[in-house]
Amino acid sequence: MNFHEYQAKQLFAEYGIPVPAGRIASSADEAVTAAKSLGNGPWMVKAQIHAGGRGKAGGVKFCKTTDEVKQAAATMLGTKMATYQSAGVALPVNLVLVTEAGEITKELYLSVLVDRGTRSITYIASSEGGVDIEHVAAETPEKIQTLNVDFVEGLQPYQGRDIGFHLGLEAKQVNQLSKIMISLYQLFNDKDLSLIELNPLAILSNGDLYALDGKINSDDNATFRHKELAAMRDKTQEDETEVLASENDLNYVTMDGNIGCMVNGAGLAMATMDVIKLNGGEPANFLDVGGGATKERVTTAFKLILSSNKVKAIFVNIFGGIVRCDMIAEGIIAAVKEVGVKVPVIVRLEGTNVDAGKQLLATSGLAIIPADDINDGAKKAVAAVTA
């Protein structure tokens, strides 16, 4: 799950990580009130969307007067904003964050993430903040410090200080960085997060470190343990189809192609998309109905796939292990009838009760195209959309 910047900063503050004072606003007048409550300025007005790169898209403004605050907020609120990190999707700006604008002397980068390669929580730090870390890694990799944390020992203060020394910080700042890193480690573990990013972690004119911008992602599989995080979810920032899928315990990701996919099992779903690509087609989605698929879930899955008018064919690829092929076949038949599917449906069944499942499809009276295997199914799906 993704979070807004203001939500990330709320969590940072709870764990003692220094952040500038700020308030959110949903109107230009509220933004002015927020600015006045923060002092005499200057201020930053920042659009709240689930994407980075807001500055280049006009979503971050430096304001010296309350009139400028009002104008900046009015320009952002109620619009949709696309950035180079939003994958071409324009996200609605429903809130702005108004914060104090401190004088920055240096921008750093600091993040915490799960490194699957080393099977550890890993810190990435750089003396080059305020820019994409990917660019720094490609152009000046020597400016990046990494630290893999031992799960048993946890992060130790000396490790944070070592990172600070390598970043060229002064003694006071080294100690501040160490404390921030320990707080981030606690936050990361307490809330089951998958990413924390401070970019920039800035040194202000008084020599202190502040998290001027923050990004966090949490592990969706652990959300049930954190009702306080679930309450922060902003569904307006998410794809409507993906929201509906999550509410029905379906794993769904929208893609750009025209061949809808319904598969049981994430691995088989990815393999299905690969085979479609190998045969010259483009998948319209990733959809894993899971091992506990029911008629109702299959019907919902069809509705999800067909919610996109780009879909010109549907490839159903089921391996019956836990789930029975005859039950899936009944679900497909019921769904096609209920939803009124108008596009070709290609079905490949294999596994438990496969013969019974194929018989049900063959005698259903529906124009369902059978497939012998995954490659045959992919070829027939591609042929259906190119016919």
From Swiss-Prot:
Its EC number is 6.2.1.5. It catalyses: succinate + ATP + CoA = succinyl-CoA + ADP + phosphate; GTP + succinate + CoA = succinyl-CoA + GDP + phosphate. Its cofactor is Mg(2+). Pfam families: ATP-grasp_2, Ligase_CoA. Substrate binds at N264, G321, I322, V323. Mg(2+) binds at N199, D213. SUPFAM superfamilies: Glutathione synthetase ATP-binding domain-like, Succinyl-CoA synthetase domains. Succinyl-CoA synthetase functions in the citric acid cycle (TCA), coupling the hydrolysis of succinyl-CoA to the synthesis of either ATP or GTP and thus represents the only step of substrate-level phosphorylation in the TCA. The beta subunit provides nucleotide specificity of the enzyme and binds the substrate succinate, while the binding sites for coenzyme A and phosphate are found in the alpha subunit. This is Succinate--CoA ligase [ADP-forming] subunit beta. The lineage of its organism: Bacteria, Pseudomonadati, Pseudomonadota, Gammaproteobacteria, Lysobacterales. Pathway: Carbohydrate metabolism; tricarboxylic acid cycle; succinate from succinyl-CoA (ligase route): step 1/1. HAMAP family: Succ_CoA_beta. GO terms for cellular component: succinate-CoA ligase complex. Residues 9-244 form the ATP-grasp domain. ATP binds at K46, G53, R54, G55, G102, E107.
